[in-house]
């Protein structure tokens, strides 16, 4: 049964607001930005006149423009490797033919996937009127003709089915007007090159680390959206981050790596070099310790996930099931089989009002929140990338699934968007989390949770059990092609079974609680079913900020979930330590690489 929301009142309010709001863009032109003016004029012409003889007119047109201004600095051992400043402007034009019930979108044919018929590319960076109109005109013409072909192919496929889907293709939403002032880029308030030099100098203390890179990113973006329904947006945003990758080899040749990341909305909120150096020294020492740590052996039993590790695992396992959007129709049977094998279809579709988590657990996603218990959240926004107001979504209430994240692509359970369509670099917006908060009652202090963990180990007759303090992030850690290939091969072996990649893994001995670091572990087959019965939940709720992959949710792996500042989506997840009673770990079974013939040179 479709759960519907009444939108009539919202549409009336929005219509009244539009009369006043459309005056905003004219005032915005005082900043010499003619983007919205060019978009509006070409939109008016397309709505009035775009039609091939004997063919349907478009019922929906959207123009998306993204200005990106990036400062990127890389350093190692106290010296700069690169320092660049890049400006780009990207355009995407989407055209839909048909109607809200059945249109030209969301169809996979032999020619590929059509989210909505679109034309995309780079345009001039000067925010001028004439060249942008020219680009929009050509892109709109191409997208319209493509939409007609797509709708014809889609209708032919639907006619071949015994029963065509009844779910609409596109939801009706009230238009939103939000034209914000442009942000002025600030590159001089702090000397970022000197900070990168100073922070990376700590790597000189670790000559056995073969690859070390420290990256500073400061990104200013301005997003424009104009639709034929009346939505008009100009939203400026800042994202900044520090990311580091470190790699080496164990004595037996096993490839090892580690990473560091810290993110902030504003550049001025990034940590200062001394704090960065201290954190880099910690992850470098962890990597040094891994070089001499013993291999992990195969294991099955209780696992204690510290809060950062629990947050990472939840991000990977939850994301594929949070979306309530309908998968695209496909005339290619192999595609659906492949997506099923990769775990791309979520576990929660069609399960509204059923228990999916323990009864003491709730889960919310709230893009309008900016802090959690005084800690800043990284995934906040006011309007999503389809022009829908951001909304808090109570996904799980007391263990019962109540809601899912929605874009304007309806699904079997919900037809309306709840403002969660997100994208990176004008990719097709997908329903993705923003600030995801795992909540629970009957929680335990860290000491009590650890005692329960050891008690379970003892009752199982085990001499030691496993604690995971940190999970891997391949998007940051893999800096070389060989590193990337090693990680890909490891992930590929467990795509359909839910294998996970822990980084800092410890044996905890029951006799006295002492810890022993081990290396080479991977978690076997950990999926959402493992969280239906959680043995213990800590009260140490921790904010875990990360860059989410724009295609998160396809396979539910670390590589699929996490991204970098350069092309990811700001996100947060709040999670406590979690104790799972039955987790399986496997050891390293790959081929080690040859060690360098000579030792690393001494560093001055």
What role is predicted for each listed range?
Residues 1-9:
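N-terminal secretory signal peptides that target proteins for export/translocation
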Residues 9-10, 310:
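Low-complexity, intrinsically disordered short peptide segments enriched in small/polar/basic residues
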Residues 11-23:
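Bacterial N-terminal signal peptides
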Residues 21-26, 53, 154, 462, ...:
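Hydrophobic alpha-helical elements and their junctions with loops/disorder across both membrane
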Residues 337-604:
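Dual-mode signal for accessory low-complexity, basic/Gly-rich regions
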């Amino acid at each position: 049964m479709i759960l519907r929301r009444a939108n009539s009142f919202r549409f009336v309010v929005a219509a009244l607001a539009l009369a006043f709001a459309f005056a905003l863009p004219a005032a915005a032109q005082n900043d010499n930005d003619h983007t919205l003016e060019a978009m509006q004029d070409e939109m008016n012409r397309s709505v009035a006149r775009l039609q091939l003889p004997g063919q349907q007119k478009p019922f929906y047109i959207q123009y998306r423009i993204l200005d990106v201004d990036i400062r990127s600095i890389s350093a190692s051992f106290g010296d700069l490797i690169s320092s660049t400043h890049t400006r780009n402007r990207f355009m995407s034009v989407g055209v839909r033919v048909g109607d809200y019930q059945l249109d030209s979108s969301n169809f996979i044919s032999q020619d590929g996937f059509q989210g909505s018929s679109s034309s995309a590319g780079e345009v001039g960076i000067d925010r001028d009127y004439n060249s942008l109109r020219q680009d929009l005109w050509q892109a709109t013409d191409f997208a319209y003709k493509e939409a007609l072909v797509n709708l014809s192919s889609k209708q032919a496929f639907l006619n071949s089915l015994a029963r065509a889907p009844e779910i609409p293709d596109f939801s009706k939403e009230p238009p939103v007007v939000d034209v914000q002032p442009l942000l002025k880029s600030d590159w001089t308030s702090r000397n970022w090159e000197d900070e990168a030099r100073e922070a990376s100098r700590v790597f000189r203390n670790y000559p056995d680390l073969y690859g070390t890179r420290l990256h500073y990113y400061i990104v200013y973006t301005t997003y424009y959206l104009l639709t034929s329904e009346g939505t008009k947006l100009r939203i400026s945003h800042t994202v900044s981050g520090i990311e580091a990758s470190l790699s080496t080899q164990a004595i037996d040749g096993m490839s090892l790596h580690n990473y560091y990341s810290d993110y902030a909305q504003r550049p001025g909120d990034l940590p200062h070099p001394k704090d960065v150096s201290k954190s880099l020294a910690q992850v470098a020492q962890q990597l040094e310790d891994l070089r001499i740590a013993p291999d992990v052996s195969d294991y099955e039993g209780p696992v204690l996930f510290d809060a950062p590790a629990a947050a990472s695992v939840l991000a990977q396992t939850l994301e594929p099931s949070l979306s309530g959007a309908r998968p695209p129709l496909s005339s290619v049977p192999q595609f659906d089989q492949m997506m099923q094998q990769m775990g791309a279809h979520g576990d929660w579709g069609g399960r509204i009002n059923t228990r999916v988590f323990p009864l003491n657990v709730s889960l919310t996603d709230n893009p309008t929140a900016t802090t959690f218990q005084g800690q800043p959240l990284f995934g906040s926004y006011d309007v999503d990338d389809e022009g829908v107001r951001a909304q808090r979504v109570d996904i799980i209430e007391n263990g019962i699934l109540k809601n899912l994240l929605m874009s304007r692509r309806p699904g079997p359970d919900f037809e309306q968007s709840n403002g969660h369509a997100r994208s990176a670099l004008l990719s097709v917006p997908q329903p993705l989390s923003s600030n995801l908060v795992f909540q629970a009652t009957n929680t335990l202090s860290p000491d009590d949770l650890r005692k329960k963990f050891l008690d379970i180990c003892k009752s199982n007759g085990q001499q030691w059990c496993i604690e995971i303090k940190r999970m891997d992030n391949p998007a940051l850690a893999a800096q070389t092609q060989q590193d990337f290939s090693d990680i890909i091969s490891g992930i590929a072996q467990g795509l359909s079974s839910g294998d996970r990649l822990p980084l800092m893994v410890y044996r905890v001995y029951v006799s006295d609680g002492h810890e022993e670091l081990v290396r080479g572990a991977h978690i076997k087959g950990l999926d959402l079913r493992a969280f239906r019965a959680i043995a213990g939940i800590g009260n140490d709720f921790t904010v875990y900020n990360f860059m989410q992959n724009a295609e998160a949710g396809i396979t539910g792996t670390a590589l699929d979930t996490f991204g970098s500042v350069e092309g990811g989506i700001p996100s947060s997840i709040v999670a406590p330590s979690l104790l799972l009673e039955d987790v399986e770990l496997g050891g390293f079974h790959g081929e080690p690489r040859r060690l360098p013939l000579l030792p690393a040179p001494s560093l001055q």
